[in-house]
Curated annotation (Swiss-Prot):
TM stretches of this protein: none
DNA-binding region: 281-300
Sigma-54 factor interaction domain span: 11-239
GO biological process, one term: symbiont-mediated perturbation of host programmed cell death
Protein species of origin: Pseudomonas syringae pv. syringae
UniProt keyword list: Activator, ATP-binding, DNA-binding, Hypersensitive response elicitation, Nucleotide-binding, Transcription, Transcription regulation, Two-component regulatory system
One Pfam assignment: HTH_8
Gene Ontology MF term list: ATP binding; ATP hydrolysis activity; sequence-specific DNA binding
PROSITE patterns in the cross-refs: SIGMA54_INTERACT_1, SIGMA54_INTERACT_2, SIGMA54_INTERACT_4
Protein name: Pathogenicity locus probable regulatory protein HrpR
Function: Member of the two-component regulatory system HrpR/HrpS that regulates the activation of the sigma factor hrpL which itself induces the expression of hprD as well as other hrp loci which are involved in plant pathogenicity, hrmA and avr genes. Probably interacts with sigma-54.
Chain positions recorded as ATP binding sites: 39-46, 101-110
Amino acid sequence: MSTDIDNDVRTRWNVTALSAGHQIAMHSALLDMDLLLCGETGTGKDTLASRIHELSSRTGPFVGMNCAAIPESLAESQLFGVVNGAFTGVCRAREGYIEPSNGGTLYLDEIDTMPLSLQAKLLRVLESRGVERLGSTDFIPLDLQVIASASAPLDELVEQGLFRRDLFFRLNVLTLQLPALRKRREQILPLFDQFTQDIAAECGRSAPTLDNGRVQILLSHDWPGNVRELKSAANAICPRIAVAGRRAVEARDPVTGLRMQMRVIEKMLIQDALKRHRHNFDAVLEELELPRRTLYHRMKELGVASHIDLAAES
């Protein structure tokens, strides 16, 4: 088991910054210890949490709970469950999100977004390893491992009064910081190659080769969406989306084929930046480091839809 976990974490997160970090993930799975994963959006926290569960000795389910997606007004009943007649409209007892993780792993995604009003109640669950359904004082013991993830630095949120200090200390027993992709550029090409190999294998085709033109595009981008954005780029140029016409052109003219693939990547990067910045052009321009008129021109050339009248800007 130890070797499997060690090799798996090394394969997917094989970077100098994680030379000690992968051992933390390994020991968390082996020793059944709670773990806090920290890192920007897209750095692979969800994937690593799921993989740690798979490699652990736990036979129960992996229950992922996005803390940002739970309405605060319904949070208690959704998290802890309710008993019949707990409040108006409750006709039958039901379990919450936490109970099904009994015997398995509870993954608290984006715990940095959890309202303060719920943090104290979550702390009680983590310390007592059990829940009380809303409307009941009966304690339901749970056997679970807890993995939490955060995009914002929890210690800073504590100082700002946005996160409970005692909950932070409870979560901060084992912490793994996943570095941004721009801080481990030596992993861009190996990860991209792994993604294209995986995607190509799914559709029974050969993965595209990393020629010099594509390499320069991949290495020069800062990848603010991190591994998730890199995987999207791999999907964009993988053979499964290639139409027959493009394959025929590439077969006749490799240079033309390369240009078309580069256009696909460029379009994807612009679309991704627009989406993340909600079409805030100033933010997109700063990220892509392009003059305004150049961005407008490239968007028109590539057929990128926008909320702005590009014709008026060209």
